Amino acid sequence: MKTLLLTLVVVTIVCLDLGYTLKCNKLIPIASKTCTAGKNLCYKMFMMSDLTIPVKRGCIDVCPKNSLLVKYVCCNTDRCN
């Protein structure tokens, strides 16, 4: 009985993925922040005039489309931006 109960608890925790949150870099990559619920992507924003230096980083729910002035790069793993 105890084994069955323990098995059910473990399966519940694995299925619900309790406590998992995405971590994304801030503008300075050394610092990261934990994303709020619903924001499941990390992003980097670049100005099209200089694609080597990101001007903004953080968490986002949907990856924005690029424009003539701004390029976005999105990813979905911890500190991938």
From Swiss-Prot:
Q: InterPro entries in the record, alphabetically?
A: Cytotoxin_Cobra, Snake_3FTx, Snake_toxin-like_sf, Snake_toxin_con_site, Toxin_cobra-type
Q: Which UniProt keywords apply?
A: Cardiotoxin, Cytolysis, Disulfide bond, Membrane, Secreted, Signal, Target cell membrane, Target membrane, Toxin
Question: Where in the body, by tissue, does this protein show up?
Answer: Expressed by the venom gland.
* GO cellular component term, pick one: other organism cell membrane
Please list the GO biological process terms of this entry. Answer: killing of cells of another organism
Matches recorded under Pfam families: Toxin_cobra-type
UniProt-listed PROSITE patterns: SNAKE_TOXIN
Give the superkingdom in one word: Eukaryota
Q: Where is the signal peptide?
A: 1-21
Please provide, alphabetically and separated by semicolons, the GO molecular function terms listed in this UniProt record. Answer: toxin activity
Protein family membership: Belongs to the three-finger toxin family. Short-chain subfamily. Type IA cytotoxin sub-subfamily.
Q: Quaternary arrangement and interactors, per the entry?
A: Monomer in solution; Homodimer and oligomer in the presence of negatively charged lipids forming a pore with a size ranging between 20 and 30 Angstroms.
* Purpose: Shows cytolytic activity on many different cells by forming pore in lipid membranes. In vivo, increases heart rate or kills the animal by cardiac arrest. In addition, it binds to heparin with high affinity, interacts with Kv channel-interacting protein 1 (KCNIP1) in a calcium-independent manner, and binds to integrin alpha-V/beta-3 (ITGAV/ITGB3) with moderate affinity.
Could you identify this protein by its name? Cytotoxin I-like T-15
Q: Which organism is it from?
A: Naja atra
Q: What is the lineage of its organism?
A: Eukaryota, Metazoa, Chordata, Craniata, Vertebrata
